[in-house]
């Protein structure tokens, strides 16, 4: 009885592992094949990455950070075709017509813009030229230049906006400071201007700005800090400060500006 059972156990023992091996052999081979396939895919994925990095010219240093070469300077920058229309008030049409021969050369020669005066719409039209215009901010500079002239500034003062980048124009009204009407408004404007414009000229010379009095509107052209100093002097005159006190403050302001510059 022992021998047959032993033989059966051996057969079962031999048969059992053979079935498992038979069932597991393909799986083991598939696993091996899968491993090989996965390795091949990884290698194929890494190869394009390396080729992309090599094509892009990325060089890694010792710490693994990329090293980039110096950027190449572009000789010319492309500017999109844009246009701008600046309206001209009726009272500035005659000065614009008389000074037109001096207005368009800086726009055409310096900023490389196309300019024309539209008499029907009473606007100055500016347009960039894709081939000749190189400065992206040329159109804005030209519009600011024309706008300054239409506000009442002299031509030389307006051209300064094209040459200097730190010049601004600030506009405010007398009623923004204090609500005045009738004779009170006229007296406030007279205090700002002074006799024969002496007070206005004193503020301009002390703060290195340019001021235009257009009815109840006040336009100030200059640097940021200079505009603030001129605005403080004008506001104090509107509020009723005597001109003598304002002159004293202007002297201190002028001395500070001399120390700075």
Curated annotation (Swiss-Prot):
GO cellular component, one term: cytoplasm
Record carries keyword Membrane: no
Annotated segments matching region Disordered: 1-29
Family statement drawn from the similarity comment of this UniProt entry: Belongs to the PNO1 family.
GO molecular function terms noted in the UniProt entry: RNA binding
Family annotation (InterPro entries): KH-I_PNO1_first, KH_dom, KH_dom_type_1_sf, KH_PNO1_2nd
Keywords of the record: Cytoplasm, Nucleus, Ribosome biogenesis, RNA-binding
Protein location: Cytoplasm; Nucleus, Nucleolus
One annotated GO biological process: ribosome biogenesis
Name recorded for this polypeptide: Pre-rRNA-processing protein PNO1
Assembly: Component of the small ribosomal subunit, ribosomal RNA processing complex (SSU RRP complex).
Residues annotated as domain KH: 182-234
Signal peptide region: none
Superkingdom to which the source organism belongs: Eukaryota
Alphabetized PANTHER family for the sequence: RIBONUCLEASE Y (PTHR12826), RNA-BINDING PROTEIN PNO1 (PTHR12826:SF13)
Species this protein is from: Candida glabrata (strain ATCC 2001 / BCRC 20586 / JCM 3761 / NBRC 0622 / NRRL Y-65 / CBS 138)
Record's function text: Required for small ribosomal subunit (SSU) synthesis. Has a role in the processing of early nucleolar and late cytoplasmic pre-RNA species.
Tagged with keyword NADP: no
Source organism phylogeny: Eukaryota, Fungi, Dikarya, Ascomycota, Saccharomycotina
């Amino acid at each position: 009885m022992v021998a047959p059972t032993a033989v059966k156990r051996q057969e079962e023992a031999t048969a059992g592992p053979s079935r498992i091996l038979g069932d597991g052999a393909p799986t083991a081979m598939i696993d091996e094949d899968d491993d090989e396939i996965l390795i091949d895919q990884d290698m194929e994925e890494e190869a394009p990455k390396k080729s992309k990095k090599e094509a892009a010219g990325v060089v890694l240093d010792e710490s693994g950070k990329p090293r980039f070469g110096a950027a190449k300077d572009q000789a010319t920058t492309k500017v999109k075709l844009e246009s701008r229309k600046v309206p001209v008030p009726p009272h500035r049409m005659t000065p614009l017509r008389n000074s037109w021969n001096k207005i368009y050369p800086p726009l055409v020669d310096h900023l490389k813009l196309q300019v024309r005066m539209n008499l029907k719409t009473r606007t100055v039209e500016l347009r960039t030229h894709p081939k000749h215009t190189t400065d992206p901010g040329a159109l804005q500079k030209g519009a600011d230049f024309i706008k300054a002239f239409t506000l009442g500034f002299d031509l030389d003062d307006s051209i300064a906006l094209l040459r200097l980048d730190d010049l601004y124009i600030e506009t405010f009204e007398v009623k923004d400071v204090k609500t005045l009407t009738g004779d009170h408004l006229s007296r406030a404007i007279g205090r700002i201007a002074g006799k024969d414009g002496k007070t206005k000229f004193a503020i301009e010379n002390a703060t290195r700005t340019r001021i235009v009095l257009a009815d109840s509107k006040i336009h100030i052209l200059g640097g940021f800090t200079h505009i603030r100093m001129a605005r403080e002097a004008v506001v104090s005159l509107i509020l009723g400060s005597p001109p003598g006190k304002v002159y004293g403050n202007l002297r201190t302001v002028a001395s500070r500006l001399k120390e700075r510059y």
